[in-house]
């Protein structure tokens, strides 16, 4: 039997996904309240969290191969 002693790294993709969703919702609510500065800040947070999500997914795909 061959064992792989390489430690397994668990990548959390769900948290940045949920954070991006929340930031988009908060951005939408800020627009409805006519707080465009907050809306823009939350939109940027959604972009940043989406990039973290993408990186996590890319890492998971590389580990799969």
Predicted regions and their residues:
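Short, charge-rich amphipathic interface segments used for partner binding and complex assembly
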Residues: 22-64
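Short, charge/polar-rich alpha-helical segments
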Residues: 2-14
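Short amphipathic alpha-helical heptad-repeat segments
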Residues: 12-23
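Short intrinsically disordered terminal tails
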Residues: 1-5, 61-65
